[in-house]
């Protein structure tokens, strides 16, 4: 498989018919291939997220990250856009689902698509990946330390981020969860509660929690980065999407 890719900014139709900015990367070799919607974290549509999109393309998947903040802050820097959206209460859940649906529709229409779409998110994006998988017919979902699925957040958390564990019966696809045992949001107790509920419901899922890792252990540009956990996590992501997306 060649790792040659093409990456570009595109426009997709999101929630309510809104045209929103998105970052697309895809392999240059032919399909058929599965696709991945990358949901950016709370810090926004930033260079690290775009690098992740390109990483998926280099590994054989068409990948697309919608800019969830493009309505409120078109053209703003990721930091400024994130700060403004947080001050407005965050991204409403209904709008998030509509934007992911639009991104999935865009990916399925690409030449070479095999019709299968997964979703992945880190931090708030992990919660959003779970939300999307409980709201849309997807083929796979990866939640990387997504908080506030089970629990209410502290005062600094955007008002839109309410617990969504009640949506678990609607989970439409297999779920991979990757967590740090030293994380506080979500803490091990919240991870265990989500695991217990999905097991009770008979929902296919696999969770892995890493010793010595806290929130953001995938982030190579942050002090929270933990190479061993991140490398193993990526290995599990490739295996999971290989099985579920083809």
Task: Indicate where each model-derived feature is located.
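N-terminal cap/leader regions of alpha/beta-hydrolase-fold enzymes
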Residues: 1-246
């Amino acid at each position: 498989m060649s790792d040659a890719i093409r990456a570009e900014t595109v426009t997709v139709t999101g929630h309510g018919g809104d045209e929103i900015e998105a970052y697309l990367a895809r392999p240059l070799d032919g399909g058929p291939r599965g696709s991945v919607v990358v949901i950016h974290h709370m810090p926004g549509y930033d260079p690290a997220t775009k690098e992740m999109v390109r990483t998926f393309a280099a590994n054989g998947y068409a990948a697309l990250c919608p800019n969830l903040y493009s309505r409120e802050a078109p053209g703003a820097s990721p930091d400024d856009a994130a700060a403004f959206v947080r001050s407005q209460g965050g991204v409403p859940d209904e709008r998030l689902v509509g934007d992911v649906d639009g991104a999935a529709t865009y990916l399925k229409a690409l030449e070479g698509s095999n019709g299968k779409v997964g979703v992945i998110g880190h931090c708030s994006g992990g919660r959003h990946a779970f939300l999307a998988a409980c709201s849309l017919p997807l083929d796979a979902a990866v939640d990387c330390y997504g908080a506030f699925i089970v629990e209410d957040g502290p005062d600094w958390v955007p008002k839109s981020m309410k617990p969504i564990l009640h949506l678990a019966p609607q989970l439409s696809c297999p779920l991979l969860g990757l967590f740090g045992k030293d994380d506080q949001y979500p803490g091990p107790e919240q991870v265990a509660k989500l695991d217990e509920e999905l097991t009770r419901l008979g929902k296919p899922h696999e969770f892995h929690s890493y010793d010595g890792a806290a929130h953001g252990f995938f982030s190579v540009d942050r002090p929270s980065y933990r190479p061993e956990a991140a490398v193993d996590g990526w290995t599990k992501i490739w295996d999971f999407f290989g099985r579920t997306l083809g």
